[in-house]
């Protein structure tokens, strides 16, 4: 990868993780809307936002080319399921007072990224990277052994998003066209659920306040912009390098949870956080050292 692509990847990764870091504040504004309904709005409005974006940028030719490759279309169905599951779990966690565990999941994610990079992409581990991954695993095992609890939400978020990044990197499609097809795969299910199954005080948009409907529609922008940045970064950077930036998002989430939303980390969570933070410190120092050697 050339220097220009790398610079673009870095900027896109920074933008993606910053927006994701402050995204919980948006979902807290609509905490009274069920998580599954918010997910359907994310899918529906993201699809229409992508249609508008592709129309403005005149990139429908790329969509036509993509539609001629059935293998990529079906792989995008897999990535759609992965990202849809990740979205649902994240929304539920934030609006059910598990923002700290959500942040833990995204602290773990860069370490899962380098693990998947080694297993599926042939990327080699350096010694310090091995140490970082081992410490992260130890943190989860200590929580399980000592406190009898397992960070299910954190692990679910970490692995679903890591596999999503891996699949998108293997498909190697342009960010916007890939996002359009992913939301197109999810659109029928989302529409059937929202308009045919969901029955809550907020599920009927015609009866909602205009302010609520605008917030629900904004889910498309909140979802699409950082995801486009991420998928753009994933095609320009090594998966292990991409993991380097992900501490930005969970750090912002952690600060939001503790400072603004009154979540207090228990002893079990703090043990795991401590291991993960040490692992990330080692990972970052190793990355900086390696970069300087180059």
From Swiss-Prot:
InterPro entries: EamA_dom (IPR000620), RarD (IPR004626). One of its GO terms (cellular component) is plasma membrane. It is found in: Cell inner membrane. Residues 18-145 form the EamA domain. It holds the Pfam family EamA. It comes from the Bacteria. The chain crosses the membrane at residues 12-34, 38-60, 73-95, 100-122, 129-146, 150-167, 180-197, 212-234, 239-261, 271-290. It is a multi-pass membrane protein. Residues 1-11, 61-72, 123-128, 168-179, 235-238, 291-294 are cytoplasmic. Belongs to the EamA transporter family. This is Protein RarD. It comes from Salmonella typhimurium (strain LT2 / SGSC1412 / ATCC 700720).
């Amino acid at each position: 990868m050339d220097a220009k692509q790398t610079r673009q990847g870095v900027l896109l990764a920074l933008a993606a993780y910053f927006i994701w870091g402050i995204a919980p504040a948006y979902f807290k504004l609509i905490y009274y809307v069920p998580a599954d309904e918010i997910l359907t709005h994310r899918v529906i409005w993201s699809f229409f936002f992508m249609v508008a974006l592709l129309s403005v940028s005149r990139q429908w030719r790329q969509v036509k080319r993509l539609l001629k490759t059935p293998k990529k279309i079906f792989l995008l169905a897999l990535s759609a399921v992965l990202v849809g599951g990740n979205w649902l779990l994240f929304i539920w966690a934030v609006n059910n007072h598990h923002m700290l565990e959500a942040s833990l999941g995204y602290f773990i994610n860069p370490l899962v990224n380098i693990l998947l990079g080694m297993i599926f992409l042939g990327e080699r581990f350096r010694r310090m990277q091995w140490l970082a991954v081992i410490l992260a695993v130890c943190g989860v095992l200590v929580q399980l052994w000592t406190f009898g609890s397992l960070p299910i939400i954190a692990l679910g978020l970490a692995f679903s998003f890591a596999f999503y990044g891996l699949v998108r990197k293997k498909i190697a499609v342009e960010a916007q066209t890939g996002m359009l097809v992913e939301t197109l795969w999810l659109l029928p299910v989302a529409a059937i659920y929202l308009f045919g199954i969901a029955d809550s005080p907020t599920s009927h948009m015609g009866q909602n306040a205009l302010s609520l409907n605008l917030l629900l529609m904004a889910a498309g922008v909140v979802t699409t912009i950082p995801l486009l940045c991420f998928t753009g970064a994933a095609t320009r950077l090594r998966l292990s390098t991409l993991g380097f930036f992900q501490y930005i998002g969970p750090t912002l989430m952690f600060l939001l949870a503790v400072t603004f939303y009154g979540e207090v980390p228990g002893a079990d969570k703090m043990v795991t956080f401590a291991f993960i933070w040490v692992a990330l410190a080692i990972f970052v120092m190793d990355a900086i050292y390696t970069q300087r050697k180059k």
